[in-house]
Amino acid sequence: MKKILVIITIFFATISLSCAKETTFKKELFDKALSDGKIIVVSSWIKYCTSCASQMKVLDKAKKDFDNIEYFKFDVTNKEIAEFFNIQYQTTLLIFKDNKEVYRSIGETTKELIYDALKSSI
């Protein structure tokens, strides 16, 4: 039983540490990307959230596959940013195109569905 608990603990620690969890959102960079007409993805996360780690893993791959899109992420406990986007939950994913929000999901971690949303915004 102890071995199973140790394995589970190591597994979840690895998942949460495998993704760089930093805030890359800066309002001035977001505004510039909007004014430049870029497609923008904003994602929210929180420490120790395994679904956040799963979503970040998909988005990290998407950055390589959709390099014409600007990506921002932030810790949902940052109330100023969360209120700016009207986000109340971690793993909220937003896509902006032509200066408006065109997609919003909460908790989506499926690569296929996230990629479909990205493709439809291009």
Segment roles from a protein language model:
Residues S35-K47:
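Short active-site neighborhood of thiol/selenol oxidoreductases, capturing the structured segment around
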Residues K97-I122:
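Non-catalytic, surface beta->alpha helical segment in thiol-disulfide oxidoreductase systems
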Residues F85-L94:
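Structural micro-motif
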Residues I4-T14:
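Sec-dependent N-terminal signal peptides
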Residues S51-D65:
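Typically the conserved alpha-helix immediately C-terminal to a functionally engaged Cys/Sec
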Residues I4-L5, S18-G37, S120:
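N-terminal leader/targeting and pre-domain segments
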Residues S44, D67-E80:
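Thiol-based oxidoreductase modules, predominantly thioredoxin-like and allied folds used
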Residues K27, D31, I46, M56-L59, ...:
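Extracytoplasmic/secreted envelope proteins and their assembly/folding machinery
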